[in-house]
């Protein structure tokens, strides 16, 4: 009877231990980050790219400044506020989030400089803003690569 009880106890303990081994906190945190917490931020980014896409049809710097001041900067600032409320549980996902915050901060700096340049007609300020926007795109590429690598390391994938 003792042998049967000991065997049964070992089986129960083994099942319990194996069930605990299947959990990956980074995977869970990343899935939550991408599919829940970043949902609104990603929607804002889509609106940002759509608004910038309209610039080709705008006739003058005043219209571009209005686009920046009335639409783009509020979207970027809103994204930065939403990002403040996101608190990943793992260091790996925190690092990914920090990369995205840097992207948005760089967009903000670029849009602010472009807005000022449109108002003052200062070519140097416009160039500075354009360079910052190019830097933001490069940072976004780095964010996406880091995100894809982390997802791959933890058995997930990123869909765009």
Task: Please provide the spans of the model-predicted regions.
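Internal alpha-helical transmembrane segments of multi-pass membrane proteins, especially GPCRs
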Residues: 6-10
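Alpha-helical segments in soluble extracytoplasmic regions
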Residues: 29-104, 109-111, 116-158
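Positively charged n-region of N-terminal signal peptides that target proteins for export
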Residues: 1-4
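C-terminal motif of bacterial Sec signal peptides marking the signal peptidase cleavage site
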Residues: 16-20
């Amino acid at each position: 009877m003792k042998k049967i009880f000991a065997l049964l106890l070992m089986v129960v303990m083994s099942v319990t231990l194996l069930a605990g081994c299947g959990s990956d906190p980074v995977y869970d945190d990343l899935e939550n980050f991408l599919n829940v917490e970043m949902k609104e931020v990603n929607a804002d980014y889509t609106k940002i790219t759509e608004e910038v896409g309209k610039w080709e049809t705008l006739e003058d710097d005043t219209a571009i400044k209005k686009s920046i001041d009335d639409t783009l900067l509020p979207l970027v600032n809103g994204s930065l506020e939403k990002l403040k409320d996101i608190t990943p549980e793992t260091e790996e996902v925190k690092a990914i989030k920090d990369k995205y915050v840097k992207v948005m901060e760089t967009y903000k700096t670029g849009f602010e400089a472009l807005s000022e340049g449109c108002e003052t007609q200062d070519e140097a300020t416009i160039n500075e803003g354009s360079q910052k926007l190019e830097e933001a795109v490069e940072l976004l590429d780095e964010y996406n690569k880091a995100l894809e690598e982390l997802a791959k390391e933890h058995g997930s994938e990123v869909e765009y």
